[in-house]
Each structure stands twice: as structure tokens, then as C-alpha cells.
Amino acid sequence: MMSFYKSFSIFLTTALLFGCGSSQPAPDIFALPVSYAVGKKPEVVIAHDMNNDEFPDIVVVNSADRTLSYFEGLGDGTFKDAQIIETGREPFAVEVADFNGDYIADIALCNYGDGEVSIILGQKDGLFKLKTNVKVGRLPISITSGDFNNDEINDLAVTLRFNKMIVLLGVGDGTFKLAEAYQAAPTPAHMTVSDYNGDGNQDIAMVLNAMKVRYLKMFYGNGDGTFAPPQLIGGGSQSSFLTHHDMNLDGNLDLVSSSLMKDSRSIFMGNGKGDFTKMQDFAGEKGPHNIVVGDFTGDKVPDIVVCNRRGGSISVIPGNGDGSFVYPHYNYVVGSQPRSIAGADFNGDGMMDIAVVLYQKKILEIFLRKTSAL
């Protein structure tokens, strides 16, 4: 197993200012990070309770190693040494859900180099076992799950880099059958799933990472595993990441996107009936990619934390509870080439913490909150 080592980094002793006054001196809300070794070119980090012990665990996708690093959380902010799980070529995107009905979290993984999705089943003993590989097509780049046909079994949707979305319907034993392929050009990227129009069926929202594209696509589900032709939601520009949350506390899900190339983030306010209103884009640090939403300021209002790949930082953007945000935001330097972040309460103190993977250094950093409010 990979060794665990502590790195009392100096990165968070000072909050640095970046570009054009877009950030301000940041309050000292994070403890110094603790670091864990991961594989080469860590692409994605996710936090999830994988073994039903009520403590969040961490999965890291190591794209150059053909491995996953699984860190079992101990509930006090520390983790066991990594369990290494072998994958296909160039693992790139990951989703976690129960795919075989045993109430234990499983892993669905896009192998970019193989054109496959690997289904890796979680076991009662905390280990993982490859169940099957599903051919989906050339260059799978994003994956998400939901019950698309209302049979209480998790299904999958996969985007292929240039033009398609593939739907895989779950059988219930960890295997899947290929259902439909949908045209999703140009350059479909990240997806998120929920019922966005209130009809009881799961829908898929998608961002497009093509130049000069300034809209999102929404595939409204029919409830039988098929989807209506996509509707366009105006806004964003060459977006690369998408998530959802109720940002204005009106009971309806909103969409939050980021553009790695345009250095911007966008908010789309939902009305619960499938309509979205784009709010004004807000600029930030260089290379924003994945986003975590949660209460990071202790005011019971959702905030946004963004991983800035080219900026070497994470940005904490406090929300006002009405869909607007504090500006300038707070910026924390974390190290060279942060690739992905995840948020969870890793030590059980009721405060959201952050996990960050650094691409070149091959490490996972855990930033624990040390104060509940700004």
C-alpha cells in the first residue's frame, strides 16, 4: 500500500491575492493540510461513505497509473493507507452508487483510453472487485448515475468526448445493458442528474466544452429510460463542469457551472418546472474547474468552493442565500496544479472540510476546518 505522510505545508499560512482584485485577504478557517500519496496524474477526487460506517471515505482516480486510490476514513479527519484498485487505460471520470442492490457503494469508472466503463463492486469486507467492463465508444469523458426508468435500479449516462451521450440501464446485479445513444454535440462534457421539472422523472443537465458555445443542454427524462430531444439553456461559455444545488433557498434546484478556459463561473436559477434563468457570470481565479457546494461560512447558507487548476488555489465564494454571492471572494493557495476537489465533514465536527489532489506532486491534501464562521 502507498505510505501515509504528513506535510505541514506553508501554503495556507497566508492567503494570497490574485488577478485584478478578484479576491480578498482570506480568513484563517482551515488547519494546515495533511497529505497522502496517490498515483501518477490524479485526475479526480470524490468523497463518499463507501463502507457504511457513516464516515466519508475518499476515492482518487490516477489517470497515468491505471489505478484508483481508496482511502478509508476513520472519522477523525485521518485515513487508512490507500487500497489500490487496478483499472483500464487512462481512467478519467468516476461515479459512485449502489449498482447491485446490496446497499454497499460501488464504482463506475470511465476508462478514456479503452472506450469502456468498468463496474467495480464494493464488498462487505471493505474491498472491491471488478464486475464487468462495458464498451461505450471512443473517449468516454464523463459519467453520472440516476434511476432513468423508475425501476429503483441505478442506471448510467456517459458522455463521449466529441458528440454523444450513452445511456446504460442497470439490470440490478451490477451489470448494464446498452440502451440509447443521443447526439450531444458539440463536445459534451460534465453532467448532473435530478428531476428538474417536477414530473417525477430523472433528467440530465449537460455542459458543452466547445469554443463559442454559450448554452447548456437539458435532456428531460420520459421515465422509461429514454429522453426527449435536448432543450438549450442560454448562458455559460465553453463550460467544463456542472453541479446543482438550491442556491437561493426557494426549494428548487439551481445549476452552477464553470469554464476552465474562460476563467468564469455561471449560475442558473431554477423554478422547479424546468425553466432556468441565467444570472450574471462572475469572474475569478485562473482555470476554475470542479465545484463543491456547501455551508463553509457557518451561516446555514450554501457557498461555493472552486478548484482553480491554473491558479494553484481554491476559492471560497460565500453565498447570500438569495442566489447572489460575496465579491470579492476568498482565495487559498494549495499548491501547483490542483486538479480536483471534494467536500465532506471528515472529522465529524459538523463543519465541511476539503480534499484536494495535486496533479504534479501526486498527493492528496486534506484541509480541515478549524472555525465554523468567517
Can you say where each PLM-predicted feature lies in the sequence?
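Blade-edge motifs of beta-propeller repeat domains
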Residues: 20-40, 72-89, 121-138, 169-186, ...
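Beta-propeller blade termini
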Residues: 43-52, 72, 92-101, 121, ...
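Bacterial N-terminal signal peptides
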Residues: 9-17
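Beta-strand-rich domains and repeat architectures in extracellular enzymes and scaffolds
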Residues: 37-55, 60-63
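Hydrophobic beta-strand segments that make up the repeating blades of beta-propeller
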Residues: 46, 58-62, 107-110, 156-159, ...
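Blade-level signature of beta-propeller repeat domains, shared across WD40, Kelch, NHL, RCC1
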Residues: 339-374
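Short glycine/acidic-enriched loop and turn motifs that connect beta-strands
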Residues: 64-66, 113-115, 162-163, 209-213, ...
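Glycine-aliphatic tripeptides that mark coil-to-beta-strand junctions in extracellular
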Residues: 54-56, 103-105, 152-154, 200-202, ...
